[in-house]
Regions:
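Aromatic/hydrophobic pocket-lining residues that form π-stacking "cages" and hydrophobic walls in ligand
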Residues: 19, 115, 174
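Residue-level detector of alpha-helix initiation sites
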Residues: 9, 13-14, 38, 162-164
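Conserved N-terminal/central alpha/beta ligand/cofactor-binding core
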Residues: 35-125, 130
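Glycine-rich, phosphate-binding/catalytic loops in enzymes
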Residues: 26, 48, 173-176
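N-terminal Rossmann-like FAD-binding beta1-loop-alpha1 element of flavoenzymes
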Residues: 5-32
Length: 193
């Protein structure tokens, strides 16, 4: 089995799934790695199990950031309307609850299934139950030792999320990696998004 990829994404939540899909669309070989046997657990429980997947009125002014232009560039590349188009492409019925909040009529599982289908369409390899024991960088290559062997890539994305819900798999892995690579981490504060 070849474990060398252009991109490895660690964390199979909403951000990790979308990042994997978009990298695949750009012609990159992608492996999405997660420690859990189930992916996208936070999506599954969001919105009371119906997944509040976007807001019609989202725009850069709704976000607080040290870089006031970050959200502008992000929204210029992918908007809530792009995601709504993806939902429609997969024939997922949804409704507006209040103030632009969009929810699935049936279940959040539809969103998870859609994201997995999009990963498959982009030839993203999904590796569940993959426990990482070490992560190193040598020149332009990352090496990731796991219980399933050694993976390597030239681009690594850490999309492990925060510490909000440990019982569904949240860990401090991303923070430990940030510390290992001397990346600045801001003070952690509870927030409602």
């Amino acid at each position: 089995m070849n474990n060398t990829y252009d991109v490895i994404v660690i964390g199979a939540g909403a951000a990790g799934l979308m990042c994997s899909i978009e990298a695949g669309k750009r012609g990159k070989s992608v492996c999405l790695v997660d420690h859990s046997s189930k992916i996208a657990e936070k999506i599954r429980i969001s919105g009371g199990g119906r997944c509040n997947f976007t807001n019609l009125y989202s725009n850069p002014s709704n976000f607080i950031s040290n870089n006031k232009h970050f959200c502008k560039s992000a929204f210029a590349k992918y908007t809530q309307n792009d995601f709504i188009d993806l939902i429609k492409k997969h024939n997922i019925d949804f409704y507006e609850k209040k103030l632009g909040q969009l929810f699935c009529i049936t279940s959040a599982k539809e969103i998870i299934d859609m994201l997995i289908a999009e990963c498959i369409a982009q030839n993203v390899e999904i590796s569940k139950e993959t426990k990482i024991s070490s992560l190193t960088k040598n020149h332009n290559t990352y090496s990731i030792k796991t219980n399933k062997g050694v993976y390597s890539c030239s681009s690594l994305v850490i999309a492990t999320g925060g510490l909000s819900i440990p019982k569904i798999g949240a860990t401090d892995f991303g923070y430990r990696i940030a510390k290992q690579f001397n990346l600045k981490v801001t003070n952690l504060l509870p927030a409602l998004v």
